[in-house]
Amino acid sequence: MYAIQNCKRIEMKICIFGGTFDPPHIGHLLVAQTVCEEEKFDKILFMPANKPPHKKNISRVEDRLAMLNFAIEGNPNFEISDMEIKRGGISYTIDTLKDIKSSFIKEEDELSYLIGSDSLLELSQWKEPEEILNNCNVVVAIRPGFRPSDIPAWILHRIRFANIPRFEISSSNIRIRWRENKTIRYMVTLPVWEYINQNKLYA
């Protein structure tokens, strides 16, 4: 399940969807499916981070992988890669892109990287941001309140915005609602909800 061997073929359009997925929610799935259809990607590759450079106190890798597996189950266009987890340490996007391009895809394949507009605001602070733009097409899912004028011109001219619906769901809000004993049903898939409940995550 956690592999990308099926992505090996000429002129395949692959889109990496990186994140902590703590937990993966309906917004993640709707964005991924819509982008897949709108951009005509052959595969959306979910890439859970081992240790994000800007986040702390995240759930165990095993829990996040299990929830993500439940979330995408049954969708032939979705796959999971544990590349960043196996690499260990802090997960940097540029390292992942270089690893994928050198080991898993052909020169003729097209590689894209999907991020939210909230992450786009921080892209200039990521490790080797110019190299990220050189190694893939950055596709941005716009979140409410986003203003293109907040993005440096050298980045803005080298990305493209996806034509997708905007959702007000976030993993952090889900964790807060759970701790406050508020429902998160319909914000995550039922198997993910059951996993969170059974394993007492976010308590």
Which residue stretches match the model-derived regions?
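Nucleotidyltransferase catalytic core that binds NTPs
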Residues: 2-203
